[in-house]
């Protein structure tokens, strides 16, 4: 079997044109370089050099072999470079799974900032339901995920992040638009556009209203918070949504107000548990946490 040391010696002779200079290049003795060339010729059964006195002349076969050997060494050099860049976290790829609300706009900003000084880093962002985030990350199809449903889940490490307050959305001209904070009791008898009954935020909203003895007209439900915002903007009612979606929709005709009592909006970062996250993933996680802490949303 051809040895890498033999190929290194052959390459050195081809580059320098002689045994002595090749020996100096690879820092071994001239007899050692001669032996490596001889062993290589015996291994492949081909004469690589014509010897005339102290001079060497590469054969045609040596020229062909040299092209392949050069590709081999160029590949190794490229791998060395890639490894060095990976160590510096300037190369690599990230696969991130995220549920809808943060993916609308917030995650785009995080990714934009993160790759600004990492030109060789690629990011794939997949927007899927929270339960799917947990499944995909636990199976290691993704490096990191953001999910609402982040309790004890097999194969996952869960890291809670700052909890925000849900907000109240009002249509333009609503009787409550002059209030800085809308209280649950203010919504007595109002048309309340609701999220799906299986939504955690819907359950928490219902609990807050029930605790205050408030009865609303729940004629319209939507499984998507963006649809809820659109319905509010059309004057169909008021709504309680997460701050990410409210912020994303803020350019449209809706009025955003604080809501009391507090309706908490919890979510978490999830990572596979099988092994420590690569450096690139750890740095993205840190950037994500910094961005969350910098948000102007009301925290709990």
Curated annotation (Swiss-Prot):
Residues 19-38 bind DNA. Keywords: Activator, DNA-binding, Plasmid, Transcription, Transcription regulation. The keyword Nucleotide-binding does not apply. Gene3D superfamilies: Periplasmic binding protein-like II, Winged helix-like DNA-binding domain superfamily/Winged helix DNA-binding domain. PROSITE patterns: HTH_LYSR (PS50931). Residues 1-59 form the HTH lysR-type domain. It holds the Pfam family HTH_1. One of its GO terms (biological process) is positive regulation of gene expression. GO terms for molecular function: DNA-binding transcription factor activity; sequence-specific DNA binding. Belongs to the LysR transcriptional regulatory family. This is Regulatory protein NocR. The gene is nocR.
